[in-house]
Structure formats: C-alpha cells, structure tokens
Amino acid sequence: MFKFNEDEENLKCSFCGKDQDQVKKLVAGSGVYICNECIELCSEIVEEELAQNTSEAITELPTPKEIMDHLNEYVIGQEKAKKSLAVAVYNHYKRIQQLGPKEDDVELQKSNIALIGPTGSGKTLLAQTLAKTLNVPFAIADATSLTEAGYVGDDVENILLRLIQAADFDIDKAEKGIIYVDEIDKIARKSENTSITRDVSGEGVQQALLKILEGTTASVPPQGGRKHPNQEMIQIDTTNILFILGGAFDGIEEVIKRRLGEKVIGFSSNEADKYDEQALLAQIRPEDLQAYGLIPEFIGRVPIVANLETLDVTALKNILTQPKNALVKQYTKMLELDDVDLEFTEEALSAISEKAIERKTGARGLRSIIEESLIDIMFDVPSNENVTKVVITAQTINEETEPELYDAEGNLINNSKTSA
C-alpha cells in the first residue's frame, strides 16, 4: 500500500475530486490518485460490460428464417436438414433466454441434434456455420478418438476442453457453445465386430457421453489428457451446451429396409424402386439407430434427427461456385494476387464433381482435386511473368494434363503440352 508523507496535504482523487479525508483509501499512481469509491465504480462497469459481451449472441437471437438465410450463403442444398437445424437451434437458444424465475411448471428440455448423411455431404460445415451465425464458441471432436475410462485414448471431458479453449477459457461463454461430434456411428456396438478397440470405444463411450449430453457439471483437466487425483479441474455445466452429432451410418439403409420389409414385399419392381437410399434415410426412426448399435438411453438424448442427401454432380458444381467462400472463388482470388486470371470451364467443373463422386468423398474431396490440378501452376506462375491467364479444362482433370496458359495478348503458351 502506498504510504503518504505527513507533509503532503490536500491530496485528491484524480477522478472524482474528493479529498483523502472524504474517502476510506486513496491509491497513488504515477502523478495520479484514485479513491476506493472510484475503484469500486470502475469494477462494476467492467463487470457489466463483460456480462453484456458474454450474453450478446444470446440476446440478439436470429429467427429460424434468418438462421437458414445465413446457412444458404455457405451451404448449398440440404434444404430439409437446414430447416430442421434452424428450428432446433432457435428453440435451444430461446430456451436459454427464458431461463430464470419459473412462472409455471413447464420445463423446456434440451434437444441435441443428429445429422445423418454420407461423407462430404456438409455435416461439419452446417455445424460450423451455425456457430458463426450465432457468435458462440464451437468445437469439433472425433468420436473415434474417444475411449472408455481406463484405456488409452481421450476422455469425453477433453471434448469440453476444446470448447473452453475456443471460448478463451471464458466458462460462461463456453456453457452456451456448440460441440460437433463427428463419426458418432463408429461408437455403435456391433456384435459381429471382433475388434477389442470397439469394446472400449463403443458402448462404454456412449455411456460416458450420456451425462454431458443431458446436462451435468463436469470436471475438465485444464491441460487435457487423463484426470489425476491432485490435479486442479475446471468446472463446466453442460446443461446449455448444444451437441450436434454427425455420422455416415453406412449400411443403415438395410436396417430400415428390414423394418419396412412387410410394406415392400409384394410391390412391383417399379414400386420397390421408390425405396432408394435417399427415400429410406428420410424414414429413419429411433428404433433403426438402436438396431444399428446405439443404446436407447443415448438415442433418447438426441431427439432431433436430420438426414442429409447424397450430393449429385449438379449440387457439387453449385458448391464449387455459389457459396460466399466457394472454392473456385478462393483459388481465383489466390491467383489474382499474382496478377493471373483463373478460369474453370463448365466441363472442368463437371469433371471435378464426377471425380469427387467416384472417390466417394463428396464436397470434402473437391479441394484436393482442384489442388492436384493446380499445384504445378501455383509453383511456376509466381516466377513466370508471361502467364496472365490459366484455364482449367476437363482434360486437365480427367487426363491430369497441364492447364491452358495464356499470355497478355491472349496467345496460348503451352499448346504442345495440352494437345496430347
């Protein structure tokens, strides 16, 4: 504590102007003084602003239509899934907003969401975009890395640590965040699977996830890893954390077919054709997930199920060009920085999309296909001032030939290389 000399008189608070006799304490700085009353006032102002910033995303909750409009800017197709997500997320945060003194006996329970669809159909992107729309912390976890307590692998609490880190260790903010757990179908119990790791990363992990899905105060190791008896823990309440679970659930169509079997038998082949993969997924029920290997208690914690469609060539072409951050726009911008124009022909876009379908990677594989066709160009162009335009053709994608290169006069530079 700063001690005043006896010969110093008329010391005043530099903020409110009160003499030292009018306040309990006067703290000195470099040529300035502040009294205890002003310190308390400043503390209150800072606390109010912090509280306001923490709840800002929640108080400005967009409507389901506004949420879907924002999703449409970044995610192409999947209209049903986007609508289901928009309504579910809106209801979740509306529920948080109205928490407080109970005016009646109606308790609004949390509704976590399951996204079922093939690899590359947009499950992760949907979850990421939702978090950005709502300005809440977001974390991604892979269910295959989780194991039952006592085995090598991640505890389920490590999922919460990622969310806390995304919130810059602001626990209040983290408690209103979103966690996306991918490949949730990989922790389904399957009697025909003889893998030992399936036993410790299957039903045991489902049991461990139950509490945090429903809502509990979890103890999280600040450095991650396994818990130790004398380790200081971070306490976090998961009641208001929204969990979105994603998985491809390969083969679940057969489970649905068995359930619908008596309805399909006796139909003509044309009628049976209606039960294609997409139509079957649209009829998924909780009992199908249970038959697939998820335990009933786990299914009960995830009441909302949205299925994503397999992306066809048209959808993938739209994904390449239409979103705000579309890949074609990204690579075009990248080459613009080297004063080079980049162009994709319609046939090239179709070829990229067809190759992604052939590889069964969906939208997730589009970037790697473009990267493969452009890697040499992005290496050479910065040191070749003659090139002002690059054109990606179907031949570039299908035959892995060099893209067409043009100079400032529009002359094709590498004609001999592309004519093969």
Swiss-Prot record:
InterPro entries: AAA+_ATPase, ATP-dep_Clp_protease_ClpX, ATPase_AAA_core, Clp_ATPase_C, Clp_protease_ATP-bd_su_ClpX, ClpX_bact, P-loop_NTPase, Znf_CppX_C4. PROSITE patterns: CLPX_ZB (PS51902). Zn(2+) binds at C13, C16, C35, C38. Keywords: ATP-binding, Chaperone, Metal-binding, Nucleotide-binding, Zinc. Pfam families: AAA_2, ClpB_D2-small, zf-C4_ClpX. One of its GO terms (biological process) is cell division. It comes from the Bacteria. Residues 1-54 form the ClpX-type ZB domain. GO terms for cellular component: HslUV protease complex. One of its GO terms (molecular function) is ATP-dependent protein folding chaperone. HAMAP family: ClpX (MF_00175). Component of the ClpX-ClpP complex. Forms a hexameric ring that, in the presence of ATP, binds to fourteen ClpP subunits assembled into a disk-like structure with a central cavity, resembling the structure of eukaryotic proteasomes. Belongs to the ClpX chaperone family. ATP-dependent specificity component of the Clp protease. It directs the protease to specific substrates. Can perform chaperone functions in the absence of ClpP. This is ATP-dependent Clp protease ATP-binding subunit ClpX. It comes from Staphylococcus aureus (strain MRSA252). The lineage of its organism: Bacteria, Bacillati, Bacillota, Bacilli, Bacillales.
